[in-house]
Each structure stands twice: as C-alpha cells, then as structure tokens.
C-alpha cells in the first residue's frame, strides 16, 4: 500500500521535468522563428523558456543523482569552490549569449550586420550583434577552461561527457553562426533560415549540457585528494574511474590518435594538387581552409581506426603502446573524437571551400573506416591493394577545391597514389609479419609469404612508375617534373629490386622510408613544374 502511495506521488514528479522541457522548447522555438514576436517580448519569452528548461534539467538530473556530500580539507574545498565558480560563470555567460541571440533574431540584426567579427554598421543593431558575439566568445573560452579543469581534477565519466558535449556543441554552433553571417550576404533564403535555427538551437542545447554538468558537480562528491596525489600510472584494464586522472601527457595521447605523422604526407598531396590544376595558383585562404578541413577529416578517420582496431593493436608490438591498448584513454573517446572531427571537417570544407571537396573528403573518410578498417583489413589478403584507395583521395580533394570539378588528370593523381600504397605498406608488413600473424590480420606476407610479397612489390612499383610518366605525355606537366620523376622513380625501383633479391629487414626498412620521401618529392615536383616552369 505504501509503495503504491509513493508511486502515485513520485510518478507525476518524474513527468513534470519533461513537461517543462517540452513547454520551454515550444516557447523558445517561437522566438527562433524570427519576426513572430517583438524584440523585447522575444527576449522575455526566450529568457523564461531557457530558465524553465534549465530548471527542469536540474530537477531531473538531481532526481537521478543522489547527493553525496564529502567533508573536505582547506585545499580541496578551495578547489571545489573554484571549479563551481567556473561552472556557474560559464552557464551564466552562455545564458546571456542565448538571450541576446534571441533578441538579435527578433530584431533582424542579421541583415544589418553582415560582416564578421565586427560590424560595418553602427547603432543599436550593431551593438546588439556585437554583444551577442562577445558573450558567445566569452562563453566558449569559459567552457574550454571548464573542460580543462574537468579533465584535470574530476574523474567522473558523467561530468566529462557533459562538458565534452557542451564544448563540442559550442564550437559547432560558433561555426554555424559564422556560416549564417556569410549566407545572409546573399539575402533571405532557406539555408539562412536553417542556419539560424541550428545556431540558436545548438547554443541552447550546449547551455542545457552546462546545467546538467553544474548540477552533477554540486551533487557528486569532490575528489578530496585529486590535487595532492601524483598521477596514476596507466595500466591495461584501468576503469574510467581512475583513467586519465592528472595524466600530464593526455593531450599528446589524444593527438596521437589522429596519427599526425601520416596526415602530413596526405595533406602535402592535397596542397600540391591545388597548384597543378588549369585554374592556376589558388588563393592562400582557399589553401588554408582546404588544409584545415582535410587535416581534420583525416584525423577523424584515423581516430575511429584506433577505436576499431583496439583488439588488433593490443597484440602488436608496434601498436601495443598506443593510448587505447595501453589503457591510457577509454576506447569510446577515440570514436567520439573521430565523429566530431569528421563533422567539423565536412562543415568547414562545405562552407569555405565547396561541396564537392567536402563530399570527396567524406568519401575518403568512409572508405577508410568501412571498406578498409572494418571489412578488408580483417578478411582479405588484398586489403592494402583495395583499401589503399582511401589514401588516394587527398589529391582529388585538392583538385576539386580549386576547380569545383574533377578531370581525368585528377583521376591520374588518384591512380599514382593508389599504386604507390602497396609497395610502401608491404615493405612495412614484411618487417611486422609476426605481429600481423599474431593479431590475425591477413596481410599478404602472412598469407602468401615473403617471396610472393617481394614479387608483388616489384610489379606494383613498375605499374606506379608507368603512371608517373603519363603527365608529360598528356600535356599536364613538363620536363622539370619528368626529370624528377625519372630520378626518384629509378631509386624507388632500385630499392624494390634489391628487396626482391636479398629480402633483408634492412632493405625493407630502406624501401619503406624512401617510399615516404618519394611521394613527397613526386608531388612537390608536380607543383614546382606547374608554377615555375609552365
């Protein structure tokens, strides 16, 4: 009887926060539509709606998370006050940014302030727009500082997830806000309306994540000795509770998930491809945006690769020291990082380069993740041959970024990288053959043996060299490139034939290392020939 009575009381209370959330979102949506309500009324409605949303989220979070007070010493108590002050400051500043955003939407300042970050116009409209942008920038900095503090001294997974969502949403909404200003220069359109709704909607969602974070920080026990004890030494099997606490090399570990050393060569092929198109020398801003978008897209695919290959990496000496198999970073962090980087990269390329470049970069991302990592790498001895197509997308992205289209010349660049990949990677596979066998990865040396692998390296090397001779024949490049390609290609063939003959680890290492230099020399020679000697 008591249980039924308690249920009768608590059930409506559990439903109440969700009812408040729905009502708040409906009210806020009316303001986002823009022009439906006057500016001051819009500010009042949005303010009440956001306050109601925050209160409902705080109530719901508090009901789900029981309070666990802890008596703290002076140092820990001071750290807790500082952390909560930062959390409340970030929440408050973002609340004001959301309100000013709603006021700007109702007042239509988007059409009077179409420059960024400042305003060419003066008056009340400019003041409103600048106030909103200043508050949004301040909120972003506060959330970033809060994220650093959360990862440094708070080990609870729920807090880290909440602050990651808040920071990620805030960064994305900033990009959408910039895109909104650029799109508005072309007048009212459906993309502008969509961007406006996304911009304010994302900021409101980020504010909700901050409210949840602050509520959790108030209810959860603060680590009494988090600032005093030394960092934990990571071990395989460590739980999220102790993982990453005070780890000084955390940033380095996250960067390593993206494999920056590999990306640098990919980006080089992207940049040089931009300089050999018929369109001539591209603008520096276009090169920079393409480089940033391409780098982030490749970083995202590599991060997801680390997540998917965690069971393989732990069995290999070369990869066993990576952050995930060594236990320094939870695997799901790599997945979340990869998805976030891919989304941001696509937005950057689509907005500041062109849609074709964004689609091609995304195609390379999906090719690498699904066709190579998930499917071929684990099932076929041809994994490197077919999967190597993923690494050949960067030249296509660079070409499309400048021309807005693809041409046979761009596909030739794709083929050159495609045929370069097997000799390059099989040389490493010969060296790491035992590791791949232990991990159950059917690389060609594991399945067919050393002799067949060395023979295939020579075959693909000859095919690659034949392709590199085509640009001058097709009138795409001239004699300067041809001389560089002949000399560097001859040295590549020398290493491949030497490996075919003696099959030593030393020769395999020599071919592997030179193949990296060779691709860089080849594409730089293309750009130099086009820019200097054309």
Swiss-Prot record:
One Pfam family cited in the UniProt record for this chain: UbiA
Keyword DNA damage part of the UniProt annotation: no
Protein name (record): Protoheme IX farnesyltransferase
Signal peptide boundaries: none
UniProt cross-references to InterPro entries, sorted A to Z: Protohaem_IX_farnesylTrfase (IPR006369), UbiA_prenyltransferase (IPR000537), UbiA_prenylTrfase_CS (IPR030470), UbiA_sf (IPR044878)
Pathway the protein takes part in: Porphyrin-containing compound metabolism; heme O biosynthesis; heme O from protoheme: step 1/1
Membrane topology: Multi-pass membrane protein
Annotated catalysed reactions: heme b + (2E,6E)-farnesyl diphosphate + H2O = Fe(II)-heme o + diphosphate
Stretches for region Unknown: 1-251
GO biological process, one term: heme O biosynthetic process
Enzyme class: transferase
Coarse class of the protein's main subcellular location: membrane
UniProt miscellaneous comment: Carbon 2 of the heme B porphyrin ring is defined according to the Fischer nomenclature.
Catalytic activity, EC: 2.5.1.141
GO molecular function, one term: protoheme IX farnesyltransferase activity
């Amino acid at each position: 009887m008591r249980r039924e009575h308690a249920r009768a009381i608590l059930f409506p209370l559990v439903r109440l926060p969700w009812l408040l959330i729905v009502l708040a979102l409906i009210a806020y949506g009316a303001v986002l539509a823009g022009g439906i309500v006057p500016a001051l009324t819009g500010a009042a409605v949005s303010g009440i709606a956001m306050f109601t949303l925050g209160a409902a989220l705080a109530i719901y979070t508090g009901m789900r998370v029981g309070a666990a007070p802890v008596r703290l010493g002076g140092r820990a108590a001071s750290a807790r006050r500082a952390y909560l002050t930062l959390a409340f400051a970030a929440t408050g500043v973002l609340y004001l940014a959301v309100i000013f955003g709603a006021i700007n939407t109702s007042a239509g300042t988007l059409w009077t302030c179409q420059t960024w970050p400042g305003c060419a116009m003066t008056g009340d409209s400019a003041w409103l727009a600048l106030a909103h942008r200043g508050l949004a920038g301040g909120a972003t900095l506060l959330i970033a500082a809060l994220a650093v503090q959360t990862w440094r001294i708070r080990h609870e997974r729920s807090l880290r997830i909440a602050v990651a969502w808040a920071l990620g949403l805030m960064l994305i909404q900033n990009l959408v806000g910039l895109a909104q200003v650029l799109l508005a220069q072309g007048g009212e359109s459906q993309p502008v309306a969509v961007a406006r709704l996304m911009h304010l909607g994302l900021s409101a969602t980020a504010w909700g994540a901050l409210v949840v974070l602050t509520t959790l920080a108030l209810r959860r026990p603060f680590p009494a000795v988090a600032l005093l004890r030394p960092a934990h030494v990571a071990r395989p099997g460590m739980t999220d509770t102790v993982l990453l606490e005070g780890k000084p090399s955390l940033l380095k570990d996250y960067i390593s998930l993206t494999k920056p050393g590999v990306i640098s060569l990919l980006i080089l092929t992207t940049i040089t491809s931009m300089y050999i198109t018929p369109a001539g020398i591209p603008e520096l801003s276009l090169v920079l945006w393409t480089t940033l978008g391409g780098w982030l897209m490749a970083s995202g695919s590599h991060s997801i690769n680390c997540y998917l290959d965690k069971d393989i990496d732990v069995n290999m000496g070369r990869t066993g020291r990576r952050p995930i198999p060594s236990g320094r970073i939870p695997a799901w962090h790599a997945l979340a990082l990869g998805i976030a980087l891919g989304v941001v990269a696509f937005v950057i390329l689509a907005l500041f380069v062109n849609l074709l470049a964004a689609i091609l970069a995304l195609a390379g991302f999906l090719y690498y993740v699904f066709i190579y990592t998930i499917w071929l790498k684990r099932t076929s001895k041809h994994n490197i041959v077919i999967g190597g197509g993923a690494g050949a997308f960067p030249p296509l992205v660079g070409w499309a970024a400048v021309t807005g289209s693809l041409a046979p010349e761009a596909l030739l660049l794709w083929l050159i990288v495609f045929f370069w990949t097997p000799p390059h990677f099989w040389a490493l596979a010969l060296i790491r053959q035992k590791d791949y066998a232990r991990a159950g990865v059917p690389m060609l040396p594991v399945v067919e043996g050393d002799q067949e692998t060395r023979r295939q390296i020579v075959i693909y090397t000859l095919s690659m060299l034949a392709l590199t001779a085509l640009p001058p024949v097709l009138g795409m490049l001239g004699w300067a490139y041809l001389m560089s390609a002949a000399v560097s290609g001859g040295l590549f063939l020398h290493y491949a034939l030497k490996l075919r003959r003696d099959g030593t680890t030393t020769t395999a290492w020599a071919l592997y290392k030179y193949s990296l230099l060779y691709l860089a020399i080849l594409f730089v020679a293309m750009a130099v020939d086009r820019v200097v000697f054309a």
